[in-house]
């Protein structure tokens, strides 16, 4: 999984906390190891206290695992002490009310609850403009409150796909992650996001790809292809 970052005039923002870091004012930096997140932030002159916002696609382990850590007393505390962690309310509702087996397999319930207790987890409902040019779009499907992020940076448009279309291989019409909460909703949302990407000429960023993590999509004779680009 890869983490993306955005640096605006007033905010340092991360998208998911699995691995990597980025600065959209220059380029996007991708690293393959979750343990390197803080080191890569340090490399670009950013400390954990400098992070203002963490956008979370959902609350599953591979998305939110880097959001908290144990302190010396054994308490779970946020890694980014000043940040707002933003996620859909229906994602948190699933943690509290969802199928127990699914929760145990895909979530670290205690970690998420402790993050909520810290007061730093902000629950939103539906499509929300986080900041000018940065929008959270609720898709559902993969999880009840799964969200993707539309980012406008000058003339460039980006879509961070997170878990909805995790790799380029999942652009294929019937390729939906088998552990999606609703296969039908995930398929519908996927089609809508792909259409938006085509219409807007947006750069798609695949949130779980280890290689070839971003590119522009084109459609010819009903078939999609990706013009991969380095970030």
Where are the predicted features?
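Active-site glycine- and acidic-residue-rich loops that bind
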Residues: 64-68, 137-147
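Short acidic/His/Gly/Ser-rich catalytic and metal-binding motifs that mark active-site loops
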Residues: 15, 22-25, 94-96, 167-171
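Divalent metal-coordination and catalytic microenvironments
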Residues: 6, 16, 51, 58, ...
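Short, basic/aromatic-enriched C-terminal tail that caps enzymatic domains
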Residues: 213-231
